[in-house]
Amino acid sequence: MFSSTFTMTVYDELKAHLNEEVPAGFVQVRGGKEILGYVKKDWAMAVASRTSDWRLTEHMSLSEEAEVTPTKRAAAMIHAAEILDMLGLLQNPQHTELVDVRASVLDPVYCQAPRNLARAFGLLTTSVRMTGYLPDGTVMCAKRLATKSIGGGLWDSLAAGLVKASETTEQAIYRELFEEAGLTSNEVTLTEGGRFVQQLVVPEGMVREIVYHYDASKSANPANRDGQVMEFATFTPDKVLNLALGGEMMYAAGMGLVESVMRRMGQRIEDKWMHYRGQFLI
């Protein structure tokens, strides 16, 4: 059986994994005075040399004309993705759907950008995760496809994914729940948990996401619909925490369970990095 002390030990270790430094050789991506992300300098040069939408000095920035309206900002992001795709640098060029981009967790949407540009430019996007509980208190997890570029073959949350442009987090978690687990809104009971920001270095660039976590009590068996899950399995919460500690689970999925376990023990995590709805940031 786990304790709050052990759970917070897991929290500290996972938090360290989820907050990686910007690597050397990256430059800031800016829109006006806002820092939107980070990109490899040679990639920034490749884009800025092929379009007037972007300028490269000590950082990469939108031109004054491209920065004027949200529509023009989005067009510049799309053009940048097209250039990187043309050069064969994007890992998933087919993911052209738009996502919302923010300068920080507290800022409104600055612009929209293609999903396939988010990692390349290290853009701050929004994602959702759900820890699924069975009536006996065990946790349902999903194993990612071994061929996934990030976390292939690792255990993951029952459902997780990026929030699309103009989509609410609740709409996104229900969509992901149906796509990844085949469950509908009348088969689960959702509870909103905490929110944190993850920053990870990946081969393509950086993953920078505002992660909203939910719990769900489910009444039906999951069935994957999008082909992105190898298998589903149930574990006790302490087993899941040990999977996360052992590197056998996506770090963000482990963090979601840590937040959930603490909340179910009647304790919020007292750390500004983990934020709860209605909580004031000082």
Label each PLM-derived region with a short phrase.
Residues A223-A253:
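NUDIX/MutT-family hydrolases
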Residues M1-L154, L162-F178, L183-P222, P237, ...:
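N-terminal leader/linker segments that precede catalytic domains of diphosphate-processing enzymes
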